[in-house]
């Protein structure tokens, strides 16, 4: 295992725990401000749009000044966004908090670049797959922490997420290794041309996958409430189940599957699972499923 890998992994996992605290409760929280289902969708979209616009800039900045400072900046932005969301008294401040969080949400992509800096080429799929298991940890611990902290009031989970991001930023300053060194940018330029067909196809697949998962995040708590009468705790339990599956697949099975079938063999099966996930909510008609 490359030196510094587990520090990077822990930083990402803690960041995603904060994300997991917020996601299951955000829709219901927004309804307290009079938000409709459509407005909740726009709220999630505002985070994603800010991330879409700013993540490439953060990636380029990490090439110039290093991975570590950009990850720290992202974590500080996440803390600020979480505190603003928790302190919001009106809907526009809720949007402002999510936009701040999204604009600074480049920690995962920069962390993946840091792992690519550290890892030998043959080990990159396995190590980046293990980094993906941090999503699972976030969705296991985050909803549980969010559900418990919500007992103190609807604003409390966002403050908890903000405190966690602040602690994570301080720990990153102290512990996170710098993996990007002078000359690396020039050395790696041209490995894949920006307009290459391979990169375009990967970008399209990635966009569709992230869009599907974001739609699930944005709508599930409202869908579960209105169709099955799920409480916030019940919705959090579903996200916890998603997290457990992510930990098993990304943390253990992914490396073996890629070794046996290759990335091109694993991608279609993953897409098929997403399709089943999207279709399955239409099947049950009661709380029993």
Task: Label the model's feature ranges.
Residues 1, 177-205:
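Juxtamembrane intracellular "pre-TM" segments in multi-pass secondary transporters
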Residues 55-65, 249-263:
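Helix-to-loop junctions at the C-terminal end of transmembrane segments
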